[in-house]
Amino acid sequence: MKLNQNLKNLLAPTKPKVQFANKNISKDIILYMDSVSVSFDGFKAINDLNLTINNGELRCIIGPNGAGKTTMMDIITGKTRPDEGSVYLGQYTNLLEMSESEIACAGIGRKFQKPTVFESLTVYDNLSLAINGNKGVFASYFGKWRKLNGEQNDFMDNVLHVIGLEHTRHYLASVLSHGQKQWLEIGMLLMQKPQLLLIDEPVTGMTHGEIERTAELLTDLAGEQAIIVVEHDMEFVRQIARKVTVLHQGHILAEGTLSEVQNNRQVIDVYLGGGH
């Protein structure tokens, strides 16, 4: 479902307070990774990685298993600290100086491949939990997060509309289809008004119709949030990607349109030649 301007305004991420800018980073860039490397027991999982994502961009990351895709997302979210390099959210926020929780609060939301919703709670309650996530799960289960104000309720209504679950708000999450659970988790991230979404293989296990709806959802959201999608399903990548980055052995092997990377001889040899 296409977003009208009112919905776009409501979903627009909260901008951080102005700090000292990194002058190497353009104001158009939301994610900046420069010369990033990390090793585990002598194995270089990320090797001199340089990656920039623009505000509102939807970028697909592809590559063979072990290429460094998960480690890259771990570094962005603070789960893994690199041995070398710089990682910034926009011009002002040095992610390497922040904890995982601080990074999440700064505006980076991550969705893993398997949906992680609270199945014993309703769709409404899952979204309520997300909007007041800083209160903690203990407080949430005792109902303190249910007292949303009018603005928060309006915002939730809009998120439900965007993810296509407005008619299931009082359903338990356990009765939702796999695709609906994925959309609910995306909605939970949207409740926090992120600047950047990291989404890992969102369409695995979905029906054809759910895949089509997910493609529409992500392309509609791009522009308000920047989105990085890690995906192996090349047909899905074809539906959503304007620009594709191919990772191999921890660094960028190729970058460009899907057509450009599919015709790149190195990409064919190390990835697409395997039947992808």
Name each region found by the language model.
Residues 26, 31-33, 46:
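Conserved structural motif at the start of ABC-family nucleotide-binding domains
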Residues 96-97, 159-175, 180:
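Conserved ABC nucleotide-binding domain
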Residues 86-106, 143-146:
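ABC ATPase NBD Q-loop/coupling interface
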Residues 62-64:
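The feature captures the beta-strand-to-loop junction immediately N-terminal to the Walker
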Residues 77:
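Helix-to-loop junction immediately C-terminal to a conserved catalytic motif
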Residues 20, 139-168, 216:
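Conserved ABC ATPase "signature" region
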